[in-house]
UniProtKB/Swiss-Prot annotation:
Lineage: superkingdom: Bacteria
Protein name: UPF0213 protein YPK_3712
Taxonomic path: Bacteria, Pseudomonadati, Pseudomonadota, Gammaproteobacteria, Enterobacterales
Record-linked InterPro entries: GIY-YIG_endonuc, GIY-YIG_endonuc_sf, UPF0213_domain, UPF0213_GIY-YIG_endonuc
A Pfam family of this chain: GIY-YIG
Family: Belongs to the UPF0213 family.
Species this protein is from: Yersinia pseudotuberculosis serotype O:3 (strain YPIII)
CDD domains: GIY-YIG_UPF0213 (cd10456)
Domain GIY-YIG: 4-79
Length: 95
């Protein structure tokens, strides 16, 4: 599983909150969240909408990228949703 391609995703709750996560299968993970079997932070938050996702490389890179995105302000996350960049690794993890 370490060779799997990971993805970073953002979900919007009914109240407008943005949730950031990583997975190897975006559709499966969204279904888990919608069924209340995903992150506790999303339980009882109403309808969830996938508003952004992109490839994030291997698990290690995905975890680093997730951390960086979670540090962004809501305004910066909204810009990601609007701009829909295909690769965040070049934006956040460049040496």
């Amino acid at each position: 599983m370490s060779d799997s391609l990971w993805h970073l995703y953002l979900l919007r709750t009914a109240s407008g909150m943005l949730y950031t996560g990583i997975t190897t299968d975006v559709a499966r993970r969204l279904a888990q969240h919608q069924a209340g079997k995903g992150a506790k932070a999303l339980r009882g938050k109403g309808e969830l909408t996938l508003v952004f996702h992109c490839e994030a490389g291997d698990r290690s890179t995905a975890l680093k990228l997730e951390y960086r995105v979670k540090q962004l302000s809501k305004q910066q996350k909204e810009k990601l949703v609007i701009d829909q960049p295909r690769l965040l690794t070049t934006l956040f993890l460049a040496s």
